[in-house]
């Protein structure tokens, strides 16, 4: 796991947020094996702190929907209050939770899904962000 302050490539890092340690480790391993630089957080508050510390290195946030203290939708709203361009992928076992993210410009994916789909979601989100930055 990459902790706070450890370097990842500029705007190509993945901030992975999940309170479930097993899910976090599995997704981190999948993304690392695919060549991504990954930093992890287990709460929305720690994710926000890491995002501030690594703002110039994180290119996409992948978060779970259900977490203690602050939900994925609360995390997304906090990120969107400061950053409209950062791609965010929300993962949830509750497809009906999609409504909580309307208007927040996220990719919502119902769980479960194959590891290859996570890789493609991250890759396409990073590619889209790079195109948007290039057009700006």
Feature map (PLM): residue ranges:
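Receiver (REC) domain active-site loop signature in two-component systems and cognate sites
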Residues: 67
């Amino acid at each position: 796991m990459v902790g706070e302050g450890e370097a990842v490539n500029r705007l190509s890092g993945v901030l992975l947020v999940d309170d479930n340690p097993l899910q976090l480790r599995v997704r981190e391993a999948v993304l690392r094996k695919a060549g991504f630089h990954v930093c992890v957080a287990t709460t929305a508050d720690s994710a926000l702190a890491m995002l501030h510390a690594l703002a110039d290195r994180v290119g996409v946030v992948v978060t779970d929907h259900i977490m203690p203290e602050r939900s994925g939708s609360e995390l997304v709203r906090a990120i969107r209050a400061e950053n409209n361009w950062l791609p965010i992928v929300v993962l949830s076992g509750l497809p009906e939770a999609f409504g909580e993210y309307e208007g927040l410009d996220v990719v919502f994916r119902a769980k479960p899904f194959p590891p290859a789909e996570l890789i493609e979601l991250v890759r396409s989100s990073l590619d889209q962000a790079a195109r948007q930055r290039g057009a700006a």
